[in-house]
UniProtKB/Swiss-Prot annotation:
Organism listed in the record: Oncorhynchus nerka
Biased composition (Basic and acidic residues): 84-98, 107-119, 184-193
Region (Disordered) residue spans: 84-124, 166-215, 236-258
Modified positions (Pyrrolidone carboxylic acid) in chain numbering: Q78, Q92, Q112, Q131, Q156, Q170, Q193, Q242
Family membership: Belongs to the TRH family.
Protein's recorded name: Pro-thyrotropin-releasing hormone-A
Classification of source organism: Eukaryota, Metazoa, Chordata, Craniata, Vertebrata
Amino acid sequence: MKSACLIILASLVVCNLTLARGQGIPAEEETGDRQTIDDIILQRAESLLLRSILKNIGDEDGANEGLTSQPEWLVKRQHPGKRYQEELEKRQHPGKREEDEDEDYDEVQKRQHPGKREDEFDSFVELQRRQHPGKRLILEQITENPAFLSELSKRQHPGKRYVMYYSKRQHPGRREVDDESDAGDLRELEKRQHPGKRYLDNTSPDLGANSPCDVLDPGCSKANLLLQLLDNVNKSRAEKRQHPGKRSAPVEDLTEQE
């Protein structure tokens, strides 16, 4: 580009000189003043032309240098820990990028204010919503997370903890697998309840067809309920004192032994 511009300038200078000499052929005495003025004008025109061409060349070079130096300027303004992140992701293995994202998320959690950290329970619920109902986490994996269990116990009612929560989240075909764990949860629920209120549950076998009255029956009096509670307590104590092979004896034999 520069060589072409120099060639053009040289050709222009040669043309101007030949024209000036061709016009200066008449007598010098008559046209002496005019030749000097023409020479001055030509020199000024040539100088202006050279300056304009050199200025254009300098502007083009400055623009090219600015484009090449822009990444360096951008790198200087960036944080030292964030430089070359895109290049690093391109060079990494595709299977290792997700691990780096998890590490970055943990680092963000550490740098956040304790009062502004995301709730683990809310994130777990969001994960459950995005998963397929048949592919959600199994009950054993949930119970291994103490933070999730503590958060769940804080939000639930004391008498209703761990009873119906898992059955709602599990697949309908897998609810029967956890019947034993549900039985353990019911025992834990009975331990936490008041002793006088354990037998007021409609689903208990003690309030079956042999019960003197139903709890929901308006004709059932408090005296009958108290008698029923006393009979149940005496029956349980008698069964504890008996031999394991004789616990199936009728109620009359139990009363005679007492």
